């Protein structure tokens, strides 16, 4: 069992007087599957970015796991989809990608098209397939 520990987390954006988080404490067991629910603009994405170390904050965030984040930012969308997926999960074998594609009901031929030619739904499923193969990381899925 691994834990994500948050203690005394306080955060606001530069130039803002409004705190997004103030002295927040909690633990998350990485075996849990949980969702953050709230109205727009309430700090869900900000929290995920704090976990990923994207912003400076006060307090402590400790984790013994690495994080993977979705949506994954693809640098070169003109590459073949298979090449994009190999960058995300370089340790995975092609047969594992085929299996994930089958589970997500994506046609295998999608792998051999440029990523930019895929529909939004196909891009989402392809990226998730690769991220699901990175088994030792904790998935942060944002909208």
Where do the language-model regions lie?
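Conserved ABC ATPase signature
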Residues: 114-122
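Catalytic Walker B motif of ABC-type/P-loop ATPase nucleotide-binding domains
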Residues: 139-143
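A short, flexible loop at the N-terminus of ABC-type nucleotide-binding domains that lies
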Residues: 1-23, 107
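ABC ATPase nucleotide-binding domain signature region
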Residues: 30-35, 39, 45-99
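Interfacial catalytic loop of ABC nucleotide-binding domains
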Residues: 99, 106, 111-114
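A short, proline-enriched helix->beta-strand linker immediately N-terminal to the Walker B motif
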Residues: 130-138
């Amino acid at each position: 069992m691994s834990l994500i520990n948050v203690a005394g987390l306080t955060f606001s954006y530069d130039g803002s007087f409004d705190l997004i988080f103030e002295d927040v404490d909690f633990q998350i067991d990485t075996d849990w599957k949980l969702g953050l629910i709230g109205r727009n603009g309430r700090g869900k994405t900000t929290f995920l970015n704090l976990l990923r170390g994207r912003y400076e904050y006060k307090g402590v965030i400790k984790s013994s796991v690495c994080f993977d984040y979705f949506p994954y930012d693809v640098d070169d969308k003109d590459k073949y989809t298979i090449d994009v997926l190999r960058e995300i999960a370089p340790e995975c074998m092609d047969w594992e990608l085929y299996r994930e594609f089958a589970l997500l009901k994506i046609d295998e031929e999608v792998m051999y098209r440029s990523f930019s030619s895929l529909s939004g739904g196909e891009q989402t499923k392809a990226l998730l397939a690769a991220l699901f193969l990175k088994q030792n990381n904790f998935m942060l899925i944002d909208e």
